[in-house]
Amino acid sequence: MKLLEIKIESSYDVEDALAYFATEDLKALGTEARRRSDFEQAGWLHDSTVVDMDDIPNLPDELEFIAYFDEETDPEEMVKCFKDKLAELAGYGLKTAPGEISVDYVADQDWNTVWKKYYHVINLSRHLAIVPEWEDYQPVFKDQEIIRLDPGLAFGTGNHQTTQLAMLGIERAMVKPLTVADVGTGSGILAIAAHKLGAKSVLATDISDESMTAAEENAALNGIYDIALQKTSLLADVDGKFDLIVANILAEILLDLIPQLDSHLNEDGQVIFSGIDYLQLPKIEQALAENSFQIDLKMRAGRWIGLAISRKHD
């Protein structure tokens, strides 16, 4: 059996959007990304190994995004869908160039594990490290919590700046045990981080079956079996209120989430947003203000923004 492989040469700006579009809208069997920055940082991350960029084959200028589909999928239709999506993203002011799309067919056993060689330990902070389940690791700091992860088909490896901003926001907020909701959990990484940092309880929601499975399996990798999982869109059908609501999702979806926050957030609760391109920040700021929320802290990594949010108080 073979798989249809769609490769897109583009920029870091659109990685999250393409991953979400491919998985949720086009029902891709899986996605992966090759980032030039991953190789440029390799010497710093992995035992000071010297990496000659000229020795790496087919290295992208910024990002090579790859999506895999069933062999029977119409390649022309997929190319058109991705071209239309790139045009839409460019309309938001995001860099999509060069935007070149290529099509190939690969053996189904090739893609499922090849991405693992680019995914290594991430020392996020003195309190958190993200460790692939196939790697050995000794904590750098005595009280550093290790998150074991096998992201599989779900979004959220910890490599991306948006995930790291969200995790730093959680770490800042968790000064005492809190009830936490992770909206759009993906691989479950943020829910697991909250649990590791001492959350009183954690609910993880997602609309994707693959995410529900990945989150449950990754929690089990970490010996965690009490994260509540609920398949739903954002906070729809979710009962109760929380001390902390976390969402690392696209800005367009955050706009849909904002009106749901009030009925699900405790009076003195906090919200952590990530996944916001700085060009889209004004829309988020306006929507928060219109719903009586204020921004307490802005965090930035590259062009990505993370926010710590609370209710406005007169």
From Swiss-Prot:
Principal place of residence: cytoplasm
Reactions catalysed: L-lysyl-[protein] + 3 S-adenosyl-L-methionine = N(6),N(6),N(6)-trimethyl-L-lysyl-[protein] + 3 S-adenosyl-L-homocysteine + 3 H(+)
Keyword terms, alphabetized: Cytoplasm, Methyltransferase, S-adenosyl-L-methionine, Transferase
Location of the protein in the cell: Cytoplasm
GO terms, molecular function: protein-lysine N-methyltransferase activity
Name the UniProt record assigns to this protein: Ribosomal protein L11 methyltransferase
Family indicated by similarity: Belongs to the methyltransferase superfamily. PrmA family.
Record carries keyword Methyltransferase: yes
HAMAP family: Methyltr_PrmA
